[in-house]
Design a protein with these regions (language model features):
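Conserved donor-binding loop and adjoining core beta-sheet/short helix segment
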Residues: 7-82, 193-205, 213
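Conserved hydrophobic beta-strand within the GNAT/NAT acetyltransferase core sheet
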Residues: 96-98, 207, 241-245
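C-terminal "cap" of GNAT-fold acetyltransferases
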Residues: 121-147, 244-250, 260-262, 267-275
């Protein structure tokens, strides 16, 4: 089979078309896709601030031999582009990395292609039954409802600037269907300063995200948000909480430890090449 890999005709989901690769077979049938996406993030990974995310998605129900061939071809195109992107900021230490992958075969694929192991940490904490918290009068909390594509894209642009893994629309939709789901914005003087997404999963109050805008950091807002989250969970009868954080995000790890989160497990989640 002849395999053709092309760029899309236009930018997609806030990413440049040159960073996206689509694979098709002889009959024009879709075989898979890959993309790379750069961001500069001094807050989460200050030692390697230039982050270049890569991802591969294969079509369903493909023959394994064909799937392996297409995946390698997509990887080669994507990785070459990631290295081109890296050279756009040669003065910064960079990481080319894959995101959260539950597929062990795909994780092994990245390792086989020269990526090194990197880990996320699962952390749990108990919320004391007598825990109470009053939000400061200067802080308002608003629920963010993404009822249109335009609203989702606005949120995605914000999310992708803050977090090391771009927002996945399907994953967000799945989370939004969980019990007690909230996407919250924290407002001071009518301006967004931070936010979080939370829900109940497997009996835990799950903290998917906590963020503070770069210009608002150092003011204790992260602790305000986490305290608010604890109070929200406890008000809904949930007294234990769980989250997952990149091991390299030392600021976040220390924040959660200050709330008595303890490490319970490590996952190979971010295969990486440091340049």
């Amino acid at each position: 089979m002849n395999i053709e890999i092309i760029n899309p005709s236009e930018d997609q989901y806030g990413n440049r078309k040159e960073n996206i690769f689509l694979a098709f077979g002889d009959a024009g049938n879709y075989l898979g896709s890959a993309y790379t996406y750069p961001t500069i993030n001094y807050h989460q990974t200050y030692e390697t601030p230039y982050l270049i995310f890569v991802a591969i998605h294969m079509a369903d129900d493909m023959d394994k031999v064909l799937s392996d061939e297409v995946m390698q071809m997509l990887f080669d195109k994507m990785f070459a582009r990631a290295n081109e992107i890296r050279m756009q900021n040669p003065d910064l230490k960079a990481r080319i990395y894959a995101g959260f992958e539950q597929d062990k075969d795909k994780l092994d694929f990245y390792i086989k292609n020269g990526f090194e192991e990197d880990y996320s940490i699962i952390m749990d904490a108990d919320i004391p039954h007598n825990f109470t918290y009053m939000l400061p009068e200067s802080v308002n909390v608003e629920e963010l409802k993404l009822d249109s594509d335009q609203e989702f894209m606005k949120y995605k642009l914000l999310y992708d600037e803050i977090f090391v893994t771009p927002l996945d629309g399907n994953a967000y939709t799945e989370q939004s269907q969980q019990k007690y789901f909230k996407n919250l914005s924290f407002i001071v003087d009518d301006k967004l300063v931070g936010g979080c997404t939370i829900f109940e999963k497997d009996g835990f109050g799950y903290v998917e995200t906590v963020y503070v805008l770069p210009e608002q950091r150092g003011k204790g807002l992260s602790k305000i948000i986490v305290n608010y989250i604890f109070n929200y969970f406890l008000s809904n009868g949930i007294n234990k909480t769980r989250l997952e954080v990149w091991e390299l995000n030392k600021c976040a790890v220390e924040l959660y430890k200050s709330f008595f989160y303890n490490e319970v497990e490590k996952n190979l989640m971010f295969p990486v090449i440091t340049l």
